[in-house]
Amino acid sequence: MKPAMETAAEENTEQSQERKVNSRAEMEIGRYHWMYPGSKNHQYRPVPNLGDRAGPLSSPGCFECCIKCLGGVPYASLVATILCFSGVALFCGCGHVALAGTVAILEQHFSTNTSDHALLSEVIQLMQYVIYGIASFFFLYGIILLAEGFYTTSAVKELHGEFKTTACGRCISGMFVFLTYVLGVAWLGVFGFSAVPVFMFYNIWSTCEVIKSPQSNGTSGVEQICVDVRQYGIIPWNAFPGKICGSALENICNTNEFYMSYHLFIVACAGAGATVIALIHFLMILSSNWAYLKDASKMQAYQDIKAKEEQELQDIQSRSKEQLNSYT
């Protein structure tokens, strides 16, 4: 009997509050008619809210949709993707042209016999084909990592409803972590390898600067300042001439092939370094995303168990209330 009495009391309280609100509104309308007699036939019309007026820029949900879309953009992955694309493009483009210029310099000045540098020409041609493959692979791989960043960001921030992820998705994220780590180590080797031609061209350029210096002009020792490319191992020791000295070496340094190849090798080395930084950035992002997915999946499992227990508790309480009402 007690619950029924409490319910009746609550209903009486609500009805009294509604009567107070209605009487207050009627008093306000009566006061308005008393102050303005000509408005007795006027019917009270509520003023529409500004939010009720739908416009092209204030459509319901438009602003929230834009905020949700911007919130789902993985900005860290986007920056890493742009850096990776830029580094790979610089390395592949500049490296390809610089290798072609290096072959031209060797054929014209250091190895006039084609058979002496035939192996080097084949290796450089193979490296140019490898550059094509590297550019294609990293273009695709960068897009895949960016898509994985969108997936992880949407899953963690619950942008499309409740948190949803699968064991396969977490396994794919872990696989990307391992693959990015391997590629990062490989690109460290590429970065070190790309510094070798920069070192070689720098030695030739510094030797030319010594020849051009005022202390060396007019002396007989200028013709004794030489550069022997055979000591770097890129052409065999029986290659002719293999060694260039004096004014001939200065003429090589003044050619467009040498100038372009030297600076393009520097840019290619910088591009390889940028790619290494981008892969390290990707590795940090993928590791954190994988950890977030793992923790979020555990939290989701805990919330599911908790919701199930609360539902069972509510069912028990509802059944106990029904039994109590049946007894009363």
Curated annotation (Swiss-Prot):
InterPro entries (UniProt xref): Myelin_PLP (IPR001614), Myelin_PLP_CS (IPR018237)
Lineage: superkingdom: Eukaryota
Transmembrane regions listed in the UniProt entry: 71-91, 130-150, 176-196, 265-285
GO-annotated biological processes: extracellular matrix assembly; negative regulation of protein localization to cell surface; negative regulation of serotonin uptake; ossification; positive regulation of bone mineralization; protein transport; regulation of actin cytoskeleton organization; regulation of focal adhesion assembly
Region (Disordered): 1-22
Main location: membrane
Glycan-modified residues: 113, 217
GO cellular component, one term: plasma membrane
Positions bearing Phosphoserine: 318, 320, 326
Keyword entries, A-Z: Cell membrane, Glycoprotein, Membrane, Osteogenesis, Phosphoprotein, Protein transport, Transmembrane, Transmembrane helix, Transport
A Pfam family recorded for this sequence: Myelin_PLP
Localization per record: Membrane; Cell membrane
Tissue: Widely expressed. In the brain, expressed in neurons and oligodendrocytes.
Record's keyword annotation contains Protein transport: yes
Topology of the protein relative to the lipid bilayer: Multi-pass membrane protein
Keyword check for Transport: yes
Primary role: May be involved in neural development. Involved in regulation of osteoblast function and bone formation. Involved in matrix vesicle release by osteoblasts; this function seems to involve maintenance of the actin cytoskeleton. May be involved in cellular trafficking of SERT and thereby in regulation of serotonin uptake.
Subunit structure: Interacts with SERT.
Family: Belongs to the myelin proteolipid protein family.
Name of protein: Neuronal membrane glycoprotein M6-b
Protein species of origin: Mus musculus (Mouse)
Upper lineage: Eukaryota, Metazoa, Chordata, Craniata, Vertebrata
